[in-house]
Amino acid sequence: MIRKMTQANITDYNKSCDGFTIIGRIVPRYEDGIWSYTEEIFKEHYNKQYELDDIDDSYIEDEDKAVYFYYEEDRCIGQIRLNTNWNGFGLIEEIYVAKGSRNKGIGTALLNQAEEWAKQNQLIGLMLETQDVNLLACRFYAKHSFVIGAVDTMLYSKFPSAHEKAVFWYHKF
């Protein structure tokens, strides 16, 4: 069951954030105005966890923002954080599904909720940013009709993850 974040359930924020497994990366290519990519599978897989963001009340009060939780019984096992971007797209700031609950349609349900929210807000589509090394996420977005719109090789320059590329995915309605 999907529920919008309220003051009553705000403490469930980040409960489903278990990190993710890196099994490889996409290798993007831009040619004749079209993005494509191949996959490179790593010999050794590893787990990755980013520092988690705090949440503020504006995601409850501001109509241009929203957080939705996915519950199994009373346990929060997924979340998606949305914002209205300056370019008319709904920005998926983050989407998480707890490790033990992945590959069960929860991510798809959260994306469907995001699309419904974006359409209610008269946005032209959804967008998000992920890393080239988050191959499993890239596969998920491609499966759900997202396409690469840009790749940024400098975005993470300041961080230990400087070797990663930021991949911007778009789904126009």
Residue map of PLM features:
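Extreme N-terminal starter segment of soluble prokaryotic enzymes
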Residues: 1-2
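Acetyl-CoA-dependent GNAT
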Residues: 7-8, 15-89, 93, 98-99, ...
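Short aromatic/hydrophobic contact patches that present stacked aromatics
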Residues: 96, 127-129, 170
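Conserved acetyl-CoA-binding loop-helix of GNAT-fold acetyltransferases
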Residues: 97, 103-120, 139-143
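Conserved GNAT acetyl-CoA-binding A-motif
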Residues: 118-131
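C-terminal "cap" of GNAT-fold acetyltransferases
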Residues: 131-138, 144-147, 154-173
